[in-house]
Amino acid sequence: LTAGIAHEIQNPLNFVNNFSEVSKELLDEIKEEIGKGNMEDAMEIMNDVIQNLEKINHHGKRADAIVKGMLQHSRSSSGIKEPTDINALCDEYLRLSYHEIKEKDKSFNATMKTDFDTSIGNINIIPQDTGRVVLNLINNAFYAVDEKKKSGVEGYEPTVSISTKKIDNKVEIKVADNGNGISKKILDKIFQPFFTTKPTGQGTGLGLSLSYDIITKGHGGEIKVETQLGEGTTFIIQLPT
């Protein structure tokens, strides 16, 4: 994992260093052009510097996101288990995720469905950590349905659902979407740190890895995925009660 972290942080740092060096050279050119009285040429070069600074900012934020993700990884096993209403937690994070995405993209729209087993009652979990997992899975589900909608599938209605069910001495949580599904070629990689199918800057590839650790190591549970290409994906969490 350490090698992976180093590699992931090195990439954006290389960009930061390269664009910084180029910008310094461009500033020297600007000084020369101003000295010659060529203000128009100087302004053109200045625009290149501005673009470089935007790229430096972008890659700096990328490195920052990786570091924050790794700090979450290191904290994932901490916390105190307490009796928690899992149905209320799932419902809360479903709506939280939807409204956060809607705030960023006013055109976003999706149907939300819930099916909660009221016989579950409270279960002993670390609510902040479990909430983080549920939120991550729901965020991914909304992302998946939005991507499918943007691809222009006729008559498509983006839908994300979350359900709970008591099975013997376990509680099962399902987060499902009717997005594009996950290719079998990458299915065995999705829980690996830094693996992501999202464009650069949109995901660190740490969400599912962190979720896996929280459920398996932090709670002694299981997390698995069922998917059908073109039809959608369901993540299934099983927690001991």
Regions found by a protein language model. Name each.
Residues 3, 8-61, 67, 77-81, ...:
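Histidine phosphotransfer helical core of two-component systems
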Residues 86, 181-189, 203:
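Short helix N-cap motif at coil->helix boundaries in the Bergerat
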Residues 148, 198, 225-229:
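A short beta-strand-to-loop motif within the catalytic HATPase_c
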Residues 150-173:
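Short beta-strand-loop-beta element adjacent to the nucleotide/active-site pocket used for signaling
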Residues 210-220:
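Conserved glycine-/histidine-rich ATP-lid loop and adjacent helix of the Bergerat-fold HATPase_c
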